């Protein structure tokens, strides 16, 4: 990074924080547009605001994003939700969900990302068949409990533990009902969204996995990327 590595590191961290704020603001705007500007009546917006506050996103940034999504602030830019899919290195199926104010920028950027990592961006549906559309809920709960029993009682299909947080998978149509059931059972829900779950996992060697993870991290760091899904 050169002789100014300390300064450069600070600049890089600031840039990364700015990128995170931009992505969070887009999700807030999209959520407000889809379900209205009242977080008490819009669970997606409420969770997006909570996520933004968790990383100290400025309040004025949050308020502007809500107004923009609700149509109360016109800056001449419209945020669209777009999905790109294709094959990454070693034949791994990849779906990238984007939020962008310029699809003419995002599409070529995505195409370049796939190509530069020995992948190939395909047409709509080219790898979607490798995934199941599901509801994904993440949350935590105090005290002792049986995760499997919690999942059954709430109507979820599966539950997985991930460093103190639990992921519940549901049928896509059951997302809201399961989220409400978990909340009523004392869960603090930190994420509730439609997602993609790989039907089958692509077998990889350790070296191949490094290639794929490098590609997925690259995608995740792109300005317009919202979520990345892969068959690993």
Swiss-Prot record:
Keywords: Cytoplasm, DNA-binding, Transcription, Transcription regulation. Its main location: cytoplasm. One of its GO terms (biological process) is regulation of DNA-templated transcription. Signal peptide: none annotated. This is Probable transcriptional regulatory protein Bd1964. One of its GO terms (molecular function) is DNA binding. Belongs to the TACO1 family. The lineage of its organism: Bacteria, Pseudomonadati, Bdellovibrionota, Bdellovibrionia, Bdellovibrionales. It comes from Bdellovibrio bacteriovorus (strain ATCC 15356 / DSM 50701 / NCIMB 9529 / HD100). The keyword DNA repair does not apply.
